[in-house]
Amino acid sequence: NNGDDTLADLGKELNFSVPTVTKMVGELIEDGIVMDFGKMETPGGRRPNIYGLNQSSGYFIGVDISQKRVHIGLINFKGDLIDEQMDISFEEAHPHERFERLCEIIEDFMSHTVVPKDKILSIGINISGRVNPQTGHSYSFFYFDERPLTEMFEEKLGIDVSIDNDSRAMAYGEYIKGRVQAEKNIIYVNVGWGLGLGIIVNGQLYYGKSGFSGEFGHITAFENEILCHCGKKGCLETEASGSALYRKFLEKLHNGQSSLLTQQKENEDEITLNDIIDVALQEDILAIELIEEVGNTLGKHVAGLINLFNPELVIIGGTLANAGDYLILPLRSAIKKYSLNLVNKDSSIKVSKLGDKAGLLGASLLARSKFIGLI
């Protein structure tokens, strides 16, 4: 996790023999990626050498795409975030236009960031929905060409590019730089406009056969006849997500219920998901009630995940996590009510430490790990 270490400790962490680790580290030193920081101070006996990452040997960009916004950041080789740009407008409708717009955003960021382009080794891009990181295809967004999306990005940007699912990247960001301490079995619940999971088993990201794992929002959970964007009806996402909260909030306004937002916005079309969360934090009764409803519904199904996976840690992240206790308290209560007592005792429930930066950090850290062959 980006610290300095001895060869013996690295071998234990990676489950490799010391000779294997010695060979690997030697190659990384030759490439300028790892540095030998000299002897470790010990009370007696033979003093081992300490090795660590050369933070200026290269840089990685992470791109996190949300519903209508893009976050982008730059890390050094040690994983420190050294530049970022949040909430860049991203509203083009056609997949090809969105692709071109995203390339413009990345190129603009590279032209103004604090390091020269030739020091940027790789770019990681988060995309929601079905993403196959191995082949470089995205099947939910930017799907306008049979070629791998990564290949098209590389042609346009002139730099190595990898893609991954947004929830999985967020989980990885928390694992390396966020809420995770010693835990190895983790579920990250991304409650944004949609609903997804990032799953870590025995310290490794779980992808499934084609990288499509974590489609939590598309479990059939209701007989509500609400059409999900996936084309099916009754998905969990239709009642427990940011889009569900947004839909319910507007329905209540149409039915005559009042909110602080009816005073703040002349047109209902101007209301955003973040606006609803903001007024909840200002004690808007309607917003609070609906967020609590989402938390309770979500908690019932997270209870099922706990029964199924027996994780050490469940992290709640994504846009709705910004609602704090209004989401988390009913969610915790439902988990306790609907999960098996003996199983849920093993699981801590925590809110994301990285917040809105989990995606861009996860994307850049994944780009780094893929570049050096850890994933």
Task: Describe each model-derived feature in a short phrase.
Residues 81, 138, 205-206:
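Hydrophobic "anchor" residues
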Residues 166, 192, 363:
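Active-site glycine-centered loops adjacent to acidic/histidine catalytic or metal-binding residues
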Residues 76, 133, 200:
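Short, acidic, Ser/Thr-enriched surface-loop or helix-capping motifs
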Residues 1-86, 90-118, 157, 223-224, ...:
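ATP-binding/phosphotransfer module of carbohydrate and carboxylate kinases, centering on a glycine-rich
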Residues 84-85, 89-185, 326-338:
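Glycine-rich phosphate-binding loop and adjoining helix at the ATP-binding site
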Residues 182-240:
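Glycine-rich phosphate-binding loop of actin/hexokinase-like ATP-binding domains
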Residues 60-64, 120-124, 186-190, 196-198:
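Short glycine-aspartate micro-motif
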Residues 52, 63-66, 180-181, 188-191:
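Short loop/turn motifs at secondary-structure junctions and domain boundaries
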